[in-house]
Amino acid sequence: MTNPNVRHFLADDDLTPAEQAEVLTLAAELKRNPLAKRPLEGPLSVAVLFDKTSTRTRFSFDAGIAHLGGHAIVVDSGSSQMGKGETLQDTGAVLSRYVEAIVWRTYAQSNLTDMAETATVPIVNALTDDLHPCQILADLQTIVENLSPEQGPAGLKGKKAVYLGDGDNNMANSYMIGFATAGMDISIIAPSGFQPKQVFVDRARARAQETGATVTVTDNLDEVAGADVVITDTWVSMGMENDGIDRTTPFVPYQVNDEVMARANEDAIFLHCLPAYRGSEVSASVIDGPASRVFDEAENRLHAQKALLVWLLENQPG
């Protein structure tokens, strides 16, 4: 059980709909004025831990923490004792004596919850096998910029997003939960055998009941109709390269190409968390075309994560 006296961001539904909107509003402010916020009067040191390699996560957190006047202490799994005898509970207790926050990109979601049992500083999920909630905040910021610049996060309600490809991965899970939190209708369009696990569908639908959103899982490409946002991800997620499963043939009909985009709304935008493989999950004509917002999306990792850290540090209990 996580420490009830600390607010963490381990999953998309750790923020209420109102809290998510606060983070997105702050992210927009920090994008306009990168030095607008300093969350602490004293020192700000953040442990940034990597069990999985990264480009965007590493650079965006390092730069963002520096913008906030802090210092990132970056440690990979090969240069610490984590997972080599010392319990994660002990590690969480010890790191909390040194830093003001912990950011961790790891494998099992349980790693985060184990550390959160004893950590007395906020922990941020920078990606697990189950979820990638920081990416969803960046995506939502990008959608607000393009589809609701005047209304802000409130204008996301009723917008429709569709995700095509591998529905049984961390991105699909977080899209369902995070977008439902924002009040967006979200459809996962994936072949049989590659659809989301029911536990994540249920979590997303529970949140959708609060916000009036819908969560749809289907293998039918007709579901693209009416989409304001079209999304995909790599067909072979990190760590699945040698699992013996054919991760190409089943997904070929679900490539996001010009024909798929033509089914969506005329002004629909395209998102991809990157890295992308042109000619596989997305055609070059789409990702390099006028609907693509993938580089704005990547930039917004910086702003959304800064906003999240500020919000967590300013909204701890007590």
UniProtKB/Swiss-Prot annotation:
Gene Ontology MF annotations: amino acid binding; ornithine carbamoyltransferase activity
Gene Ontology terms: cellular component: cytoplasm
Localisation per UniProt entry: Cytoplasm
Record keywords, A-Z: Amino-acid biosynthesis, Arginine biosynthesis, Cytoplasm, Transferase
GO biological process: arginine biosynthetic process via ornithine; citrulline biosynthetic process; L-arginine biosynthetic process
Pathway this chain belongs to: Amino-acid biosynthesis; L-arginine biosynthesis; L-arginine from L-ornithine and carbamoyl phosphate: step 1/3
Main location: cytoplasm
Function of the molecule: Reversibly catalyzes the transfer of the carbamoyl group from carbamoyl phosphate (CP) to the N(epsilon) atom of ornithine (ORN) to produce L-citrulline.
The protein's name: Ornithine carbamoyltransferase
